[in-house]
């Protein structure tokens, strides 16, 4: 289980100012949990993800993964960013296998593992291609495969579909659910899209503008329904989905109004 306990982050800014980015954020991600942090730009979502990844120290609070304190990056956390970080001079399969190479896995074994993951994301036919030959959605699929290569306990995903067109974005959401269902990984996903959060999350954390706080939590089962039925259209068209979308929109607007009035 991932446990985030009263996590706070302060940054030193110019002219001696201090920026309060996160304020006492707490939540858990159990086995097979898919937690989505939802909020406007600048609310601390990426700061929170970077702290979980071990890229950024907390100013206060604690993060643990399966009882171990998170204090630096580790192979137990796979990260996927909005802008892929594929190496352009390496083939798709070598990009996926990169973490395994650093871990000292022999070439034959890491190539076999990478090919297995490319099959999982539907890109095994492109194993020998190079990143420039792929579309944006395909590159993100390679990024997901690479993040899974070291068999992490949790996937951390920082708006990975934000730069994609709407149709590709929906396809990637559905692929991600399939991967989550097959691998049984924990996922922490951040987005500013209400519909994306509702569709993907077993729990949605609605965050306030800076300093980022969790102002509402929603436990959901839309993602499990989709994993069972494959019918995204009826799920998104359901009255329950629409009601929750409007409820969350109202919460986000109210937090923005409070910031404007401050």
Swiss-Prot record:
<keyword id="KW-1278">Translocase</keyword>
<dbReference type="GO" id="GO:0016887">
    <property type="term" value="F:ATP hydrolysis activity"/>
</dbReference>
<protein>
    <recommendedName>
        <fullName>Taurine import ATP-binding protein TauB</fullName>
        <ecNumber>7.6.2.7</ecNumber>
    </recommendedName>
</protein>
<keyword id="KW-0997">Cell inner membrane</keyword>
<comment type="subunit">
    <text>The complex is composed of two ATP-binding proteins (TauB), two transmembrane proteins (TauC) and a solute-binding protein (TauA).</text>
</comment>
<feature type="domain" description="ABC transporter">
    <location>
        <begin position="4"/>
        <end position="234"/>
    </location>
</feature>
<comment type="similarity">
    <text>Belongs to the ABC transporter superfamily. Taurine importer (TC 3.A.1.17.1) family.</text>
</comment>
<comment type="function">
    <text>Part of the ABC transporter complex TauABC involved in taurine import. Responsible for energy coupling to the transport system.</text>
</comment>
<keyword id="KW-0472">Membrane</keyword>
<dbReference type="InterPro" id="IPR003439">
    <property type="entry name" value="ABC_transporter-like_ATP-bd"/>
</dbReference>
<dbReference type="InterPro" id="IPR003593">
    <property type="entry name" value="AAA+_ATPase"/>
</dbReference>
<dbReference type="GO" id="GO:0005886">
    <property type="term" value="C:plasma membrane"/>
</dbReference>
<feature type="binding site">
    <location>
        <begin position="39"/>
        <end position="46"/>
    </location>
    <ligand>
        <name>ATP</name>
    </ligand>
</feature>
<dbReference type="InterPro" id="IPR027417">
    <property type="entry name" value="P-loop_NTPase"/>
</dbReference>
<keyword id="KW-0614">Plasmid</keyword>
<dbReference type="GO" id="GO:0005524">
    <property type="term" value="F:ATP binding"/>
</dbReference>
<dbReference type="InterPro" id="IPR017871">
    <property type="entry name" value="ABC_transporter-like_CS"/>
</dbReference>
<dbReference type="InterPro" id="IPR050166">
    <property type="entry name" value="ABC_transporter_ATP-bind"/>
</dbReference>
<keyword id="KW-1003">Cell membrane</keyword>
<keyword id="KW-0813">Transport</keyword>
<dbReference type="Pfam" id="PF00005">
    <property type="entry name" value="ABC_tran"/>
</dbReference>
<keyword id="KW-0547">Nucleotide-binding</keyword>
<dbReference type="GO" id="GO:0015411">
    <property type="term" value="F:ABC-type taurine transporter transporter activity"/>
</dbReference>
<keyword id="KW-0067">ATP-binding</keyword>
């Amino acid at each position: 289980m991932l446990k985030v306990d009263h996590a706070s982050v302060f940054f030193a800014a110019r002219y001696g100012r201090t920026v309060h980015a996160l304020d006492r954020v707490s939540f858990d991600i159990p086995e097979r949990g898919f937690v989505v942090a939802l909020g406007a730009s600048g609310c601390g979502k990426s700061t929170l993800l970077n702290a979980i990844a071990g890229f950024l120290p907390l100013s206060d609070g604690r993060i643990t993964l399966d009882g171990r304190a998170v204090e630096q990056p580790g192979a137990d956390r796979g990260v996927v960013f909005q802008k892929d970080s594929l190496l352009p001079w390496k083939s798709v399969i070598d990009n996926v296998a990169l973490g395994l190479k650093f871990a000292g896995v022999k070439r034959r074994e890491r190539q076999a593992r990478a090919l297995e993951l490319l099959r999982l994301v539907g890109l095994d036919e492109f194993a020998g291609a190079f990143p420039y030959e792929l579309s944006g959605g395909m590159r993100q699929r390679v990024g997901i495969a690479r993040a899974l290569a070291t068999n992490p306990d949790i996937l951390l995903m920082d708006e990975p579909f934000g730069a994609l067109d709407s149709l590709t974005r929906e396809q990637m959401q559905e692929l991600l659910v399939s991967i989550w269902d097959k691998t049984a990984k924990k996922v922490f996903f951040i987005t500013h899209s209400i519909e994306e959060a509702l569709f993907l999350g077993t729990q949605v954390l609605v965050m306030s503008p800076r300093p980022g706080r969790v102002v509402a939590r929603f436990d959901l089962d839309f993602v499990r329904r989709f994993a069972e039925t494959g019918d995204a259209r009826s799920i998104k068209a359901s009255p329950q989905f629409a009601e929750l979308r409007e409820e969350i929109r109202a919460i986000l607007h109210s937090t923005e109004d409070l910031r404007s009035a401050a």
